[in-house]
């Protein structure tokens, strides 16, 4: 049995439980001073304070009085893609909107072209490098979407890359099928046929492949309508894929309401989510997965998280790592942005609620007996210091499944 004992923890900060926290509960963090954590065979065996137990054969890590939290959970990324889109930055600076760039042949379609041309090996090498960087910032679990293939063989290729990474990289990954990310150029004049392709050709093969756990759709002006999104998500349910939805990022066309109606596990973005959308999500038990780094990168407003918390909607936060609207893979930056608005709830948002948004709250997201031994030792005395030191990487030591990264 492999054992790791983390001792001399100045402050251990963690949410508790195996499900998403909402309302006032989201701000309730357990703090333990002078703490220690014992991990056996990758699983947290015990957590305590005061006298450190003598554990025969254990590797001992001295936290040196620093802060320890759960490993961060990035519950929304577009990890698998070819190319980059730095050329679009100049267009944005000259006033082009996200939809302007997309409608001019840039945006998602540009990345689709590059992704189709890339081999599985090339995509895996690029994504593996990104995962290394993510882990260096304290992320230990990642959701990864397909969605830049937009053709059956290329969507399946992306999901195979995610499986390969999960099998061979230290990071734990959860796969989401997102064939309905955009209507590709070859179907622009026949979007109904593309929706049919996603639902009737891609979905059965995704189920047969057995990698994806969720189905996502981009419900937005100039992408997929509410009814098309409903069609895609209902087809996903038929094939055992739990629904997620990109909603209310640019225009509020009804995506957040649909999330509540269909019982999505999460709705993503929600920058312009209206009150009726918040009410629908609260009623449907939907987790709001907010992406503040995207708002920052787009120069957009931030999602109304406080209204969501007050309404009883659980809030998670993630990077939205992608080559266009948010080439950010640093969850610490997400924390920095979140702390400007959301105070203590941000730790729950980037750990336990993020885990719940990908159906892993029983395994990760808190420092508790029986969960995976995923920890971050921070070069910080407390949570306030992480929020305060904008732009610095304060992850001193990252521990994944009881092993030092």
Predicted regions, residues:
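C-terminal cap of metal-dependent C-N hydrolases
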Residues: 20-28, 350-352, 356, 372-405
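Divalent metal-coordination and catalytic microenvironments
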Residues: 9, 37, 42, 65, ...
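N-terminal metal-binding scaffold of metallo-dependent hydrolase/deaminase domains
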Residues: 1-54, 383
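Metal-coordinating catalytic core of metallo-dependent amide/deamination hydrolases
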Residues: 111-126, 132, 140-253
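His/Asp/Glu-enriched, well-ordered alpha-helical/loop segment
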Residues: 238-243, 260-262, 299-381
């Amino acid at each position: 049995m492999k054992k790791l004992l983390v001792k001399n923890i100045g402050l251990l900060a963690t949410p508790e439980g195996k499900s998403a926290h909402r309302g006032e509960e989201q701000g309730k963090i357990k703090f333990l001073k002078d703490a220690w954590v014992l991990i056996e065979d990758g699983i947290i065996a015990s957590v305590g304070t005061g006298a450190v137990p003598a554990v025969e054969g254990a590797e001992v890590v001295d936290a040196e009085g620093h802060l320890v939290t759960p490993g961060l959970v990035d519950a929304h990324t577009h990890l698998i893609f070819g190319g980059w889109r730095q050329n679009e930055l100049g267009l944005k600076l000259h006033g082009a909107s996200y939809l302007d760039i997309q409608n001019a042949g840039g945006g998602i379609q540009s990345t689709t072209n590059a992704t189709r041309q890339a081999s599985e090996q090339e995509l895996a090498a690029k994504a593996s490098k990104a995962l290394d960087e993510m882990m260096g910032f304290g992320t230990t679990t990642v959701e990864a979407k397909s969605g830049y293939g937009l053709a059956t063989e290329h969507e399946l290729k992306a999901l195979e890359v995610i499986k390969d990474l999960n099998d061979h990289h230290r990071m734990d990954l959860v796969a989401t099928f997102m064939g309905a990310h955009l209507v590709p150029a070859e179907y622009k004049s026949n979007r109904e046929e593309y929706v049919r392709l996603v639902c009737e050709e891609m979905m059965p093969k995704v189920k047969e492949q057995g990698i994806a756990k969720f189905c996502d759709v981009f419900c937005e002006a100039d992408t997929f309508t509410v009814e098309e999104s409903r069609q895609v998500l209902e087809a996903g349910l038929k094939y055992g894929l739990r629904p997620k939805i990109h909603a209310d990022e640019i225009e509020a066309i009804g995506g957040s309401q649909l999330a509540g109606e269909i019982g999505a596990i999460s709705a993503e973005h929600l920058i312009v989510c209206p009150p009726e959308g918040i009410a629908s999500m609260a009623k449907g038990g939907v987790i709001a997965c907010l992406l503040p780094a995207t708002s920052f990168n787009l120069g957009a407003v931030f999602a109304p998280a406080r209204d969501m918390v007050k309404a009883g909607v659980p809030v998670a936060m993630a990077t939205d790592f992608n080559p266009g609207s948010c080439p950010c893979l640093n969850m610490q930056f997400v924390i920095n942005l979140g702390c400007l608005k959301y105070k203590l709830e941000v730790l729950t948002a980037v750990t336990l609620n993020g885990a719940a948004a990908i159906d892993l709250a029983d395994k990760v997201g808190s420092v508790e007996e029986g969960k995976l031994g995923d920890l971050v030792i921070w070069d910080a005395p407390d949570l306030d210091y992480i929020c305060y030191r904008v732009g610095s990487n304060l992850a001193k030591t990252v521990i994944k499944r009881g092993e030092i990264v």
